[in-house]
Amino acid sequence: MTEVKTFMVKGAALFNESEFPVRQSFTKYVRALNEEQAKEKVYMDLGSKNKIKRRNITFLEIKEVDPSTVKEKRIKELSKIDKIIL
């Protein structure tokens, strides 16, 4: 059985491409099984919330971190869950 890990993803994205483009850096913490799934989660989040195209997102660093060092409450709560009943 695979274990879900916490990843810190740092990168930059081009916000507001059509009107006044601004490149902004970001740091997101996500829960995923591996680095590829962590990248996909960031693509989905930034694309759905900010309408950013995948080609406008660049990743600078993706690394696994200890869940206790993360400051986001949502990620801390998700890391405490040990099983899900469907």
From Swiss-Prot:
Per the record, its GO cellular-component terms are: ribonucleoprotein complex; ribosome
One MF term in GO for this entry? Answer: large ribosomal subunit rRNA binding
- All disulfide bonds of the chain are none
Please verify whether the record's keywords include Ribonucleoprotein. Answer: yes
Q: Which GO terms describe its biological process?
A: translation
**What is its quaternary makeup?**
Part of the 50S ribosomal subunit. Binds 23S rRNA.
Q: Which InterPro entries match?
A: Ribosomal_eL20, Ribosomal_eL20_dom
Tell me the protein's name: Large ribosomal subunit protein eL20
Which terms are listed as keywords in the entry? Ribonucleoprotein, Ribosomal protein, RNA-binding, rRNA-binding
* HAMAP family linked to this entry: Ribosomal_eL20 (MF_00273)
Source organism per UniProt: Metallosphaera sedula (strain ATCC 51363 / DSM 5348 / JCM 9185 / NBRC 15509 / TH2)
Q: Which Pfam families match?
A: Ribosomal_L18A
Reading the lineage from the top rank, the first entry is Archaea
Task: Tell me which family the UniProt entry assigns to this protein.
Answer: Belongs to the eukaryotic ribosomal protein eL20 family.
